[in-house]
């Protein structure tokens, strides 16, 4: 049956592939290094709650998310594993942080005092990880003398547990290994200074996906894999140390077919004109679903194992493909946007290259109006339609 009760445009998520990738990462870092699975951005478009449930079964040590809302969604779905919020949480939401045992990133003593005040109000202690900016220029302490002074003060706060300290590489996926080493040395020098003051922080972490593969010295107490959990490498310049498996297919189906003559215009702005008698198919996927408009007249999808070009501009909800050279196309035939069909593949990396971005952005821009259908070892185990 070509159509079922789920929207024709969908993402199939392979949870067994995600768990495989997780195990591959464990092989690299060894049993003494903890793993924080980074599942922000709805697990890079894969659906955070399902992914978290399966990684929790695999024994993941921590989850990393960007916002309070992402963390609360996981708690509401029954996730018990510790969750670190990488970003800023407004003071108005600190009650939720404490109530749901979430770990907050901190890089300011005034903020730490606000969090401690809320913790004591609830008769609890909130876990915090201190963020150090060693060269990314985003958030975190850049004055290391101030950092040391305030961290030592935080360590004595009754309402806080100073569990972790971390930083983030700016160029681990690039060729600038010297800058990575410079960042790492800054981070370790601060930690050494704190330890001389008799403060030993349990979880020290700096390694993202690229550093896991390229910079073994940076693994420390915990690593933070993100995109490699989801089957893609962070860049072409990282070592291919692991056998990553494809974790999703982004697909749709043909909903309209028409025969048109040569000289027929397709799409907004008349940006494509047929050069011969052609068969044009319409598929119900557009830029509101995550198919980038820059792929207009500039990319090929898969139909019956053959590459077919997008013709005309990608619309908000639909686009057109030229299927003239594919025999026997029918309404309901599957079209692959990202993934494999009949041993041919449209990779997330190739799409990212075409629009001059990274796989992380391509995955995370697949919108929530696209249902996620979940499989394990080829068996469908569930689906999520965010709009129901």
From Swiss-Prot:
GO terms for molecular function: alanine racemase activity; pyridoxal phosphate binding. PROSITE patterns: ALANINE_RACEMASE. The modification N6-(pyridoxal phosphate)lysine is found at residue 40. Transmembrane segments: none annotated. It comes from the Bacteria. InterPro entries: Ala_racemase, Ala_racemase/Decarboxylase_C, Ala_racemase_C, Ala_racemase_N, Ala_racemase_pyridoxalP-BS, PLP-binding_barrel. Its EC number is 5.1.1.1. Pathway: Amino-acid biosynthesis; D-alanine biosynthesis; D-alanine from L-alanine: step 1/1. The active site is at 40 (proton acceptor), 268 (proton acceptor). Its cofactor is pyridoxal 5'-phosphate. Substrate binds at residues 138, 316. It catalyses: L-alanine = D-alanine. Keywords: Isomerase, Pyridoxal phosphate. Pfam families: Ala_racemase_C, Ala_racemase_N. It is an enzyme of class 5 (isomerase). GO terms for biological process: D-alanine biosynthetic process; peptidoglycan biosynthetic process. GO terms for cellular component: cytosol. Catalyzes the interconversion of L-alanine and D-alanine. May also act on other amino acids. HAMAP family: Ala_racemase. Belongs to the alanine racemase family. This is Alanine racemase 1. It comes from Caldanaerobacter subterraneus subsp. tengcongensis (strain DSM 15242 / JCM 11007 / NBRC 100824 / MB4).
